[in-house]
Amino acid sequence: MTDAVQNEINQEQIAQEENKLIAERRSKLDHIRKNCKANGHPNSFRRDSLAGDLQKKFGEKSKEELEALNHVVSIAGRVMAKRGPFLVIQETSGRIQAYASKEVQQELKDKYQGLDIGDIIGVQGALHKSGKGDLYVNMEQFQLLTKALRPLPEKFHGLTDQEMRYRQRYVDLIVNENSRNAFIVRSKVMSAIRNFMISKQFMEVETPMMHVIPGGASARPFITHHNALDMPMYLRIAPELYLKRLVVGGFDRVFEINRNFRNEGLSPRHNPEFTMMEFYMAYADYKDLMDLTEELLSSVALEVLGSTSMPYGEHTVEFGGKYARMSMFDAIKHYNPNHAQIQALTEEDIQNRDLMVSIAKSVHVDVEPFWTCGQLLEEIFGETAEPKLMQPTFITGYPADISPLARRSDDNPFFTDRFEFFIGGREVANGFSELNDAEDQDARFKAQVEAKESGDDEAMFYDADYITALEHGLPPTAGQGIGIDRLVMLLTNTHTIRDVILFPAMRPQQ
């Protein structure tokens, strides 16, 4: 018998067992509907305590002290285990046990034909402590609030299918503590970032999610249709151009935490729908952004995790202190010490396309015919240097031809005052001194249009209204985007973006 045939037989047996369990639970629900009020789904129980709060308040008290207190609580949650007369009840803050005397057990059997793992129950009773030192509630009153018709995965085969964890995130959250903790951390990260930005006098704003002209990043957009206006529209790939319009309008410090959409591939680092925090500050440059980023990330790590040092894979990442700063050109040289062509490369050579194509191919980059010298430099960097940037590092010196919205460097106009921030071998943030020269921006938009016509699907569109806004005057401004999903991956020691997005994009199940 082949492994494939055996696996098919096993899956069929699992399905049969699951269907049997579901049928038994439906039979119990029929009994409950006939014998209980509210058609078996009451909505009158009110809890007054959470397991986590009870542990903090009473966890250090002795068994005798709790008996003397006779503190009555009402708890509610999902039955996760049955251990003799004890039920393990799980809710948002943690777990607590409930003790069912023989009389209560008989009443549960008569009323509900017994409880199953996954049922949601409300319990009222005095708080006690077991001989092992565990808190529990003595079940004096109880109510089955929701009958679970499907067994939890570990009841029949365990939640081992990674894809099923993403498709049925609700089940994953019930049975997987690591998943729950990751999304608790995510929520805290969002709150910490928001509070930090507000403390720095940034105003939170909301800009359109549907754009007439997609812009603010180099990416392929999703296209939709506005029925009332009878016109195509695009889900936003970035809020940048709208946020900078607000700076033109006089809001000197703005930020937005929201979703972006890019019609591109799926990977451990990419999801078509993702969360970004973008912010813009007038009268600042890209160096100010790097300083602010150091302060922001160390503050968030300390607030959320209680430390600026944390594990990531085999490494320990340090969010505190000053971060390394290195130009893209220098990083390529640093991480390719034995590549003769790269070691001989000068900044002037970067503009020699034939040479850059040769180097790119030598490091296994699949070169597109429409790539510019700047794109070739970035691809060489991405292939040979980026994966090695484990500790927080700002990479500066991005060429202008791949930075259409960034201000040119005063020292060398081939480059821009731009950086990308890397940690854990991946990009987490992108920032630069904004291009506020309307005529230069006009020329760069036109160059992007030419690139799009040459086959670059990710090149930007021409945005005439944004040029008009710049012609009204954008003050010297710096702006940055931070990928929330990738940041949470780092803070939770997670290596795929799907583990930090509650409902990631998936193909329909066959």
Curated annotation (Swiss-Prot):
EC numbers: 6.1.1.6
Organism: Vibrio cholerae serotype O1 (strain ATCC 39315 / El Tor Inaba N16961)
List of residues binding Mg(2+) 1: E420, E427
Reaction catalysed by this enzyme: tRNA(Lys) + L-lysine + ATP = L-lysyl-tRNA(Lys) + AMP + diphosphate
Name listed for the protein in its UniProt record: Lysine--tRNA ligase
Subunit structure: Homodimer.
Gene3D superfamilies linked to this entry: Bira Bifunctional Protein, Domain 2, Nucleic acid-binding proteins
GO terms for biological process, alphabetical: lysyl-tRNA aminoacylation
Domain of life: Bacteria
UniProt xrefs under HAMAP family: Lys_tRNA_synth_class2
Source taxonomy: Bacteria, Pseudomonadati, Pseudomonadota, Gammaproteobacteria, Vibrionales
PROSITE patterns linked to this entry: AA_TRNA_LIGASE_II (PS50862)
Localization per Swiss-Prot or TrEMBL: Cytoplasm
Keyword Nucleotide-binding carried by entry: yes
Record note on cofactor: Binds 3 Mg(2+) ions per subunit.
Cofactor entry: Mg(2+)
Cellular component terms (Gene Ontology): cytoplasm; cytosol
